[in-house]
């Protein structure tokens, strides 16, 4: 019995330490995207409108999936886009960048959120259920996208940073915030 109690305490502590990151991810209300060139973009999630999409983004960000990727698409007055893991190894301008993903796709969660300036949404191909890891942030309102792409959050600070993004600008990290 004397040996059992300390072992149970150690086991409980180990489980708590290992479970803490998962619990923190479950409670993430947003994220901070830090660029290598400097600047931060603070995002607030819409879990009530796109629960599986938020869950997927949180999982990928928590794994460091986006760290080191670059923004591969910049359309002035429209969007900036990132999330292709190939951008970690391929050069900006390589035609393959923009075609990659995490190796799976998630079901679309079209919702009532409008494509206003500063929303974050999932990029996809022609198939509505083809989104995986690529996301975009709108630089201006884009109502023609409403109901066609999954909006899962919005920029709450750092739009000046978003507006300064150029093709090739790298993500240093995406940290989850509660």
Regions found by a protein language model. Give the residues of each.
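Small-residue packing motifs within transmembrane alpha-helices
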Residues: 8-12
